Amino acid sequence: MDRIIVKPSGPLYGDVEINGAKNSALKIMAACSLAEGTFHLMNVPDITDVRLMSELLVSLGMTVRENDTNSLEITNPGNLTAEAPYELVEKMRASIVVLGPLLARYGKARVALPGGDDFGPRPIDMHLRGLEMLGAKFASEHGYIDGHCERLRGSRIVLEFPSVGATENIMMAAVLADGTTIIENAAREPEIADLASFLNRMGASVLGAGTSTIVIEGVEKLGAVEHAVVPDRIEAATYLAAVGIAGGEINLIGARPDHMDMLCQKVGEMGMRISADSNGLWVMANKSLKAVDLATLPYPGIATDYKPFLVAMLAVSEGVGIVTENLFSGRFRYIDELIRMGADIRTEGHHAVIRGVENLSGAPVRAHDIRAGAALVIAALRAQGQTEIREPSHIDRGYENLVENLSSLGADISREN
């Protein structure tokens, strides 16, 4: 049985180099379907989801080659097969973002309904409505979405919610549309700004990415380019939270503090010390943390991906904290696993009430998704006795070297097959 074993550990000390952002790399890889030629992508994390996206691109007709560590060479020969099969899409929800670029480039796309992490429904209606406003038409049957269009036409699109995936899909489609597209109430995440930077390198005209209004002037043709993916703020948050739980002092090399302002502010309220420099972030925790209340919100608010780490921190903090999930339903499932470890947590609808305890207790637990699995790993740093995290393959979807990095910082952690 594949499992991660964590035994009682002391404070963490040392350096961790932050990898490229999963949520940026996957979308940039999908955008390679927009133009012929050979793309060179750097700072790409070596994780399961990237390998799955590589398989998907190959199934479309591209070639993907690993050049050096964290570097991909993607060649698009043109005349791609505009179908993303169920066998690949079911494993990764992010696969849906090939829909927009395939429609824009080839006038058709057939994409299986997506799978991925299991934490409640995340409808793709906003993706489809936005693309329809650009001129696409869709039919859904037998578990597939079939789309077709003539050349897409620019339009003003107001999103009912700042959906990251919908913003990305519409943005990638609009770069080859005829005319101007304006996306209002757009998602503002750093990964969207990174995707826009990549598209602009290709010859697109995207203005305002990272703000709530994005303006795209369609162009006739794009070209292949080089690009380095931005650092992963979610990975950085994982190690930051690990220090909050176990204590210690580490440097997060390459982390972008400007992408993590709200998180840094919140953990500062809890008692952590954080400072930024040109190399990244320095984080320290040398005393018990104080409980706070927090709520997930679209960027620049507290990301829903941060929440499992913050819940794990609150589980061993002094006092009572209330966490409210405003973005996704069903994303408290990992709390049952923390309760198995001795956490005092009560859930009420979209709220979790967490009463901190001094230490957790080692127990066998299961990783339900990427971030929940990582949260269980770092929570185990503060557990008495051995903790066994089962189904760590979920963690592999988003982390390149979580076990190795924590071990290098002083954690007593290993992986067994």
Report each predicted region and the residues it spans:
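Short, structured segments at the rim of ligand-binding sites
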Residues: 1-417
